[in-house]
Amino acid sequence: MSEKEIWEKVLEIAQEKLSAVSYSTFLKDTELYTIKDGEAIVLSSIPFNANWLNQQYAEIIQAILFDVVGYEVKPHFITTEELANYSNNETATPKEATKPSTETTEDNHVLGREQFNAHNTFDTFVIGPGNRFPHAASLAVAEAPAKAYNPLFIYGGVGLGKTHLMHAIGHHVLDNNPDAKVIYTSSEKFTNEFIKSIRDNEGEAFRERYRNIDVLLIDDIQFIQNKVQTQEEFFYTFNELHQNNKQIVISSDRPPKEIAQLEDRLRSRFEWGLIVDITPPDYETRMAILQKKIEEEKLDIPPEALNYIANQIQSNIRELEGALTRLLAYSQLLGKPITTELTAEALKDIIQAPKSKKITIQDIQKIVGQYYNVRIEDFSAKKRTKSIAYPRQIAMYLSRELTDFSLPKIGEEFGGRDHTTVIHAHEKISKDLKEDPIFKQEVENLEKEIRNV
């Protein structure tokens, strides 16, 4: 597979995972130069974008690359100006990405500090009302692994600092004990490695890797829902670590009780320790984050420009810092000083984009569930009583109307139901909307509430 083909697939997947603003601002115009010795060199024409991608999106792209090429590749974003320093007499346009030899991939799993973003420490984490408790719990776990809260389960929306806290835990543990064996991974990567171990008959090595450690940090655990074999493997891994007093830290975009198609025995174990949630930052925290960022980068940005960003970008920290990066790039490319007017001009696409925050099926289930007094877990259950079945059909209808998810994906979020069930629900609700004006108003009100989440 050529570099161009690989990167086209990576961008296609990334577009689904990232917000439209993040994708179009930072990733859209990048190009894969080469893959060599387990490293993917990716070109970006804007220096700010290259730095930002390395800091904030390297892990996401690494996971996507694993899915596309089938082996571990670390992305490294550089500018076209930096390419001359890197090329070192290489051919200008390599045709095929080469898979590293068995010797280099057999033991390419990192247990040390290299797996963590150097910036993501407790010192750089800005504390506010929405994250004070998760920060305190994470610090307690890092100070005394398996002594305070085990497992520690951190949940919250995208870009609120869950991964930052997990990296900070890893750094702190290694600061206190450089010999500690720490693994940071995502549930997707865990699943892919598990599948590979089955395919290559390396189950024992896989289990040894994940069970002979001191701390396991696993991100986005919600993605193991509906993966029966992966859940079973993780259940035994969890038990082994917990019984041996090893620390487990888990992150998710939702609490355990709201993860559909999760085995009850796993759900109960996730609830053994402490569950903490991170909420979006308030104005003061957003300003503090921006001020800390410009201090770290030694940037000169007027307070009124920061105030504009903090007032306009309220959803999450990643979008907040991304807006700052976009402003800096815009100012540099146009050769204009940063003012409030330039800030508004640079961020107009972000601020005016009506879908900058993607509606999720969980958003829909939550709103519909609250309205009809249905628990979120009942949307995935096999119950067929009208008091549950009809709200479930409404939620399926709204999921098809308000999201870009495929029919099978929607069915999966409703207890692994077949796509034909989703089609039937959509047809049924569409018919009822035409025949019942009161019901139509009801659904329209639900839709407005969901769009305002």
UniProtKB/Swiss-Prot annotation:
Region (Domain IV, binds dsDNA) residue spans: 332-453
Gene Ontology BP term (one): DNA replication initiation
Binding site for ATP: 159, 161-163
CDD domains from the UniProt entry: AAA (cd00009), Bac_DnaA_C (cd06571)
Residue span of region Domain II: 71-114
A single GO molecular function term of this UniProt record: ATP hydrolysis activity
Key word ATP-binding present: yes
Comment text on domains: Domain I is involved in oligomerization and binding regulators, domain II is flexibile and of varying length in different bacteria, domain III forms the AAA+ region, while domain IV binds dsDNA.
Name of this chain's protein: Chromosomal replication initiator protein DnaA
Organism: Staphylococcus aureus (strain MRSA252)
Gene: dnaA
